[in-house]
């Protein structure tokens, strides 16, 4: 998987990927209108465009040029937070979290990284686990009157060889 900055021409495909991935991630826990609300809140066109213009919207693209990963990068006080959508796995392959981490580090994001994943979203959990993230605290978020439980995943900062 090749990770790159998203382009304007990617936006329609990004919206399709995020809708599909969110439905797979929380669709069995909450009604479909809650899924749509979650997609709108996290991935509406204005949010995507804002991240695109500030070069904080990344996509992971397969060898066939299909978008398999959508990443919004947000600065926090002491780390960056990722909002991700991972295409549900195919039997033969899954999106590669290691490529994402390598790309983020290459782009200069060297500090700690976190991401919040719905509990039970095994595609996302596996993605972060293989990339070296450690599971953290569980939180509950109220979305349209429904509880959505999430786990924070954390990746330590890059340590300097100079000490």
Where are these regions (language model features)?
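Short alpha-helical
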Residues: 9, 13, 67, 122-123
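Terminal substrate-recognition subdomain of acyl/acetyltransferases
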Residues: 130, 140-163
């Amino acid at each position: 998987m090749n990770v790159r900055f998203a382009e304007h021409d990617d936006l329609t495909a990004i919206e399709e990927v995020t809708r599909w991935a969110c439905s797979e991630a929380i669709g069995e826990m909450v009604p479909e209108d809650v899924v749509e609300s979650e997609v709108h809140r996290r991935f509406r066109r204005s949010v995507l465009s804002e991240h695109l213009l500030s070069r904080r919207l990344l996509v992971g693209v397969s060898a066939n040029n299909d978008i398999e990963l959508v990443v919004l990068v947000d600065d926090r006080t002491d780390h960056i937070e990722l909002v991700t959508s991972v295409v549900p796995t195919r039997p033969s392959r899954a999106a590669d979290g290691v490529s994402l981490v390598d790309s983020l580090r290459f782009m200069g994001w060297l500090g700690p990284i976190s991401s919040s994943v719905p509990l039970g979203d095994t595609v996302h959990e596996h993605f972060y686990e293989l990339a070296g993230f450690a599971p953290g605290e569980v939180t509950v978020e109220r979305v349209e009157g429904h509880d959505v439980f999430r786990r924070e995943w954390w990746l330590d900062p890059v340590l300097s060889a100079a000490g």
